[in-house]
Design a protein with these regions (language model features):
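Short aromatic-glycine-(Arg/Gly/Cys) micro-motifs in beta-strand/loop hairpins
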Residues: 18-32
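Short, charged, surface-exposed hinge/linker loops at domain edges
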Residues: 1-15, 48-87
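Exposed, low-complexity/repetitive linear segments and helix-based recognition motifs
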Residues: 7, 26, 44-46
Length: 87
């Protein structure tokens, strides 16, 4: 069983864009999620940092009651019977 938050994270990471910078390091972002960006000396480190940033972004957004974008039909803004609803 995949929990909605896990599916949301995987869907978001599927939208990630990575660029190799002039100094050889990498930047990554998820354009649909404002402010979700990361940097790393290698692509693997950048991917890991982006996942961590995304997880924090989701938790802070939910905690503050901010409306998160629906991704892949997953709406983390709705809770039904103690479970996150999917559309």
């Amino acid at each position: 069983m995949i929990f909605p938050i896990t599916a949301y994270i995987e869907a978001a990471l599927g939208l990630a864009r990575y660029d190799k910078l002039e100094d050889g390091s990498f930047s990554g972002e998820i354009p649909k999620l404002k402010g979700v960006a990361a940097f790393g000396q290698t692509l693997r480190v950048c991917e890991s940092e982006l996942r961590s940033t995304l997880e924090d972004w989701i938790l802070v957004g939910l905690r503050l009651g901010q409306k998160l974008p629906v991704l892949a039909g997953i709406d983390l803004n709705k809770v039904q019977h103690g479970r996150l609803a999917t559309t």
